């Protein structure tokens, strides 16, 4: 609009001519595979925590944000192109139709709650609590599992993008579709996170190997 006004000489110079946007990368916490397994296998004897844990694990294996996962109904589950069960529905944020194949753990959780009173009375796939309470319960679960990271409803989606998809060599274009991104540059942010993790892991491995080598040299000198 401003450029159009300058073109028509309604104004001589754009007031934003010297304005430059700056962007700051936001830290995106995610669970690694060990943390994900620890949470999934943890025995929780408090029902509300067990339900939130299961809903969170479901999001870790589907990439659904809280608002999308909470709205899922049994009607959204259908047979996909491969003959297996998929979730086929519109994503809340983009209103795009998405097709998400259900991985075994996600399917297991759906089966677990198909006869849950809340799910049956509200036609929902999962017994999800309010967003505010949900994050509070996630903090309790993290403490019980010995996970130091701050868990939120967003952490599960980041976990799906990094640990479940990209670290298992799922192509960036496929990850983009599964995450419902309209611009691959958004997905590439997760690619950079994965590269950083690989770099850190290799640095730790390098330090470990150097330590082993130093011990071997030390033992050789003693002998």
Residue ranges and their predicted role:
Residues 29-31, 35, 71-111:
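Conserved tyrosine-mediated DNA breakage-rejoining catalytic core shared by Y-recombinases
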Residues 1-4, 19, 102:
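Non-catalytic DNA-binding core/recognition domains of DNA-processing enzymes
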Residues 117-120, 205-223:
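C-terminal secondary-structure termini that scaffold catalytic or DNA-interacting sites
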Residues 57, 61, 67, 157-182, ...:
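C-terminal catalytic core of tyrosine-transesterase DNA break-rejoin enzymes
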Residues 25, 92-111, 119-140:
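C-terminal catalytic core of Y-nucleophile DNA break-rejoin enzymes
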Residues 7, 11-66, 168:
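Basic, Lys/Arg- and aromatic-enriched nucleic-acid-binding interface segment
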Residues 91-95, 131, 179-204:
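Catalytic-site neighborhood detector that most strongly recognizes the C-terminal catalytic loop/helix
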